[in-house]
From Swiss-Prot:
GO terms for molecular function: monoatomic cation transmembrane transporter activity. Heterodimer with SLC30A5; form a functional zinc ion transmembrane transporter. It is found in: Golgi apparatus, trans-Golgi network membrane. It is a multi-pass membrane protein. SUPFAM superfamilies: Cation efflux protein transmembrane domain-like. It comes from the Eukaryota. It comes from Xenopus laevis. This is Zinc transporter 6-A. Belongs to the cation diffusion facilitator (CDF) transporter (TC 2.A.4) family. SLC30A subfamily. Has probably no intrinsic transporter activity but together with SLC30A5 forms a functional zinc ion:proton antiporter heterodimer, mediating zinc entry into the lumen of organelles along the secretory pathway. As part of that zinc ion:proton antiporter, contributes to zinc ion homeostasis within the early secretory pathway and regulates the activation and folding of enzymes like alkaline phosphatases and enzymes involved in phosphatidylinositol glycan anchor biosynthesis.
Length: 464
């Protein structure tokens, strides 16, 4: 039998969770204005789609897609209000700011997909151009233009405002900027209006309405229906060119990349951190954009053994907090170990020294372990104590004991016979032609002491 839960917590459905979050957003009065504009947008879009069907105009359909994009921007603004109300949770420890980025990315990508659909339909119309009815073409153009401008200028959309300023300029903005400079050279008084970077959404709304007005005039004068398809292609290309830089910027934020314009500032701050008192090395640094205008990062700092961890942590956080709002700093103390040779009383099983050879093994630490890891910041070597040295056995390394069961004459001090090669490494120094020596013979017995902890002859006892 399974475990019986008397008060089991009920699982809410997805619709129930969405309804709960929607009630949380609507509790704020600032969101009522967004909801009102959203309702008007749905009604206006429905009328425009009906007029697109009655006029059979592909250009008006492409322009109506901008009204649908306005609906996505209103939803993004609503998500922005929701993010400000939510607090970080165990699942989303950095907060919910990335939902804003995801909403902007989804809105711009959907707008580009709509532009590609218009290009596909326009390519089919170039083969067989249908007749265009201009009865409601001009009315639909001005209704869409008025509503788009009114929505963009009335609702403060923080995510799209940040992306439009931070992303690279579109080709439409660059061409308009060139024309504005030429115009301001003739009329200097217009420099305050045209020279600043224009809002890309307002620019595409005006450019699309201008293309529809030209289409209306050419169809009314010459019945030139192909201009409607050409205007649809122009509006689709302008839409794609305007949305592409924003989707690229928001996509890079979702991929947790570091903005190029702050890399130099971060390198300067990391160099300042590496020169702080007690800091030996700064490594494993990683910084990324958490949301629009907020950065997060993590860094590992290696400090001296005698340094104050809290003081170093406070200084590092103070230096990096100017750019990184959410920062994780891990402090590591310098991990050097003092090597000490084995000293002390001899084990009982080593009293019969002539039956054993004690060979001190070299250090198992390789040269690769002594190298500092490559980091983007310079490391400062620590100052080891005078008795510290590399490639020496540690204090916890026991000597290796190899048994020697070869018979020897009792009571004779030295045997001057010739040692065969088969017994070279059983007794003595292992040099051919040298007699068998009794007792302990290693390469270190007659060497002067370097470390002060090993005394010659400590283990060299003889049994007479």
């Amino acid at each position: 039998m399974g475990t019986i839960y008397l008060f089991r917590k009920t699982q809410r459905s997805l619709l129930g969770k969405l309804a709960q979050e929607f009630r949380l957003v609507t509790a704020d009065r600032r969101s009522w204005k967004i909801l009102l504009f959203g309702a008007i947008n749905v009604v206006c879009t429905a009328f425009l789609l009906t007029w697109c069907s009655s006029t059979n105009s592909m250009a008006l359909t492409a322009y109506t897609y901008l009204t649908i994009f306005d609906l996505f921007s209103l939803i993004t603004s609503l998500i922005s209000y929701w993010v400000t109300m939510k607090k970080p949770s165990p699942t989303y420890s950095f907060g919910f700011e990335r939902f804003e980025v995801l909403a902007v990315f989804a809105s711009t990508v959907l707008a580009q997909l709509g532009a590609l659909f218009i290009l596909k339909e326009s390519a089919e119309r170039f083969i067989e151009q249908p007749e265009i009815h201009t009865g409601r073409l001009l009315v639909g153009t001005f209704v869409a233009l008025f509503f788009n401008l009114f929505t963009m200028l009335s609702i403060r959309n923080k995510p799209f405002a940040y992306v439009s300023d931070a992303a690279s300029t579109s080709w439409l903005q660059e061409h308009v900027a060139d024309l504005s400079r030429s115009l301001c050279g003739i009329i200097p008084g217009l420099s305050s209006i045209f020279l600043p970077r224009m809002n890309p959404f307002v620019l595409i709304d005006i450019a699309g309405a201008l293309a529809l007005c030209i289409t209306y005039m050419l169809i009314e004068i010459n019945n030139y229906f192909a201009v409607d398809t050409a205007s649809a292609v122009a509006i689709a290309v302008m839409t794609f060119g305007t949305m592409y830089p924003m989707s690229v910027y928001s996509g890079k934020v979702l991929l947790q990349t570091t903005p190029p314009h702050v890399i130099g500032q971060l390198d300067k701050l990391l160099r300042e951190v590496s020169t702080l008192d007690g800091v030996l090395e700064v490594r494993n640094e990683h910084f990324w954009t958490l949301g629009f205008g907020t950065m997060a990062g993590s860094v590992h700092v290696r400090i001296r053994r005698d340094a104050n961890e809290q003081m170093v942590l406070a200084h590092v956080t103070n230096r990096l907090s100017t750019l990184v709002s959410t920062l994780t700093v891990q402090i590591f103390k310098d991990d050097w170990a003092r090597p000490v040779l084995a000293s002390g009383t001899m084990p009982p099983n080593m009293l019969n020294i002539p039956e054993h050879h004690v060979i001190q093994m070299p250090s198992l630490k390789s040269t690769i372990d002594e190298l500092n890891p490559l980091t983007s910041t310079p490391s400062k070597p620590s100052s080891p104590p005078p008795e510290f040295a590399f490639n020496t056995p540690g204090k916890n390394m026991n000597p290796v004991i190899l048994s020697n069961n070869q018979m020897r004459p009792f009571g004779v001090g030295y045997n001057y016979g010739t040692t065969p090669y088969t017994t070279t490494f059983n007794q003595g120094l292992g040099v051919p032609g040298v007699g068998n020596t009794q007792g302990l013979r290693t390469g270190l017995t007659n060497v002067a002491n370097r470390y002060g902890t090993y005394t010659p002859g400590q283990f060299t006892q003889f049994r007479q």
